[in-house]
C-alpha cells in the first residue's frame, strides 16, 4: 500500500467515526495562522486543535498572493479577527538561494521556464518575520481592527 493509500484510508476512517461531530467552518478562536510547511511541527505544539484556527502553510511562511487570498477569505467570510505569522528558526529557505533552486529544477527537468517566478529564499529569520507582518499590517484590504 502506498503512502497516499494510507492517508486516504485514514481519512475514510476518520470521516466514518467523526462525520457528525465535525467542527463548524468558522475557527472557534477566530485566529488564522500563516505558517511554514515544516512537517516536524504539529499545530498541537501551539495549543491549537481541530476547529480552533485556519492554518495556512507554504515554504518559508511567506505572505504570497495566494496566502494573502486565504487570509482575506478567512477574515471576510469566516470571521477571523487575529492573524499570526510563525516562521521556523531552521527554515529550509534560509539554506538555499533563488538561483540554487532554479538550477536544481532545471537540472532535473531540463527546462529553463520555471514557475513560480520567485521562491522567496531569505537569510535572516527575524527580518523575514518582520517583513511578513509589515506586508499584512499595511495591506489596504486588511482592516485596522485585525490584530497581529
Identify the role of each PLM range:
Residues 17-69:
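Conserved beta-strand-loop surface patch within small alpha/beta domains used
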Residues 1-29, 61-63, 73-78, 93-148:
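Divalent-metal-activated hydrolytic enzyme cores
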Amino acid at each position: 500500500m502506498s503512502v497516499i493509500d494510507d492517508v486516504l484510508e485514514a481519512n475514510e476512517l476518520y470521516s466514518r467515526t467523526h462525520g457528525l461531530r465535525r467542527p463548524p467552518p468558522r475557527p472557534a478562536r477566530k485566529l488564522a495562522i500563516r505558517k511554514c510547511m515544516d512537517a516536524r511541527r504539529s499545530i498541537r505544539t501551539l495549543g491549537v486543535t481541530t476547529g480552533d484556527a485556519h492554518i495556512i502553510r507554504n515554504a518559508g511562511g511567506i505572505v504570497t498572493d495566494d496566502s494573502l487570498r486565504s487570509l482575506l477569505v478567512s477574515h471576510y467570510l469566516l470571521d477571523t479577527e487575529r492573524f499570526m505569522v510563525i516562521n521556523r528558526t531552521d527554515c529550509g529557505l534560509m539554506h538555499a538561494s533563488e538561483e540554487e533552486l532554479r538550477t536544481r529544477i532545471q537540472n532535473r527537468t531540463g527546462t529553463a521556464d520555471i514557475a513560480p517566478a520567485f521562491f522567496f529564499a531569505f537569510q535572516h529569520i527575524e527580518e523575514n518575520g518582520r517583513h511578513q507582518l509589515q506586508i499584512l499590517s499595511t495591506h489596504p484590504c486588511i482592516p485596522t481592527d485585525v490584530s497581529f
